[in-house]
Amino acid sequence: MAANGIVIVDKPQGWTSQDVTAKLRGVFHQKRIGHGGTLDPMATGVLPVFVGRATRAVEFFESAEKGYEAGLCLGRVTNTQDTTGETLEEHPVTVSRADVEAILSQFTGEIDQIPPMYSAVKINGQKLYQLARQGKEIERKPRRITIHSLRLLEGEELRLEVLCSKGTYIRTLCHDIGTALGCGGCMSSLRRTRAGCFTLADSIPLETLIAAEHPEQYLRPVDSLFADLPAVTLTAEQVKPCRNGAAIA
């Protein structure tokens, strides 16, 4: 029987999201596989993967909120807005944790964010990262995003906890925070802790899936996608009109 369902992968560092889906095609012996939100290679964490007929449900997941923990590196500006990129500027860091905490409110709520050149955003049919690799930089229009919550986590290192809308670039958020502080900044690490109703507690390490004799045991039913939504129980008389798209009183 062909595999169908949703598996929540804890993506390892160094893998692209497409690498993960390509690997799982072999694991589940299923060609129809897609993921619910790209993670950069340096990032780890929650990557929902839709298998078989469940791929039809991806469209219902695309607007899901995302949660992240990100490392903030101050004093360094790079071309990719993270520590994997080429250093463009370096500045002394004289700001304190209190200074960082005080500025976070500027980046909470609905804000405009300019997508980075190293991204898959298309302008005039070309992906920005393709232009960036050619040494080109073009004007990008700001996009409206929502940062639902943003706080600095405890610890010696600067780590941000972010809950945000679809389309938010955490790399750019780190870059913009550094700019606002006057010393520049970039992202040093990224872990997705939540995607929609799925969290790290739901995720399975990729190596576990690869090694599993029966990987289908980790598949969730498609209706798990809607676990955090209010439910309505239909009467027998309401089922048919509902299937036909009619309003239910």
Please report, for each region that a protein language model flagged, where it lies by residue:
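The conserved catalytic core of RNA pseudouridine synthases
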Residues: 24-30, 48, 137-182
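Extended alpha-helical targeting/anchoring segments
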Residues: 119, 123-142, 146-147
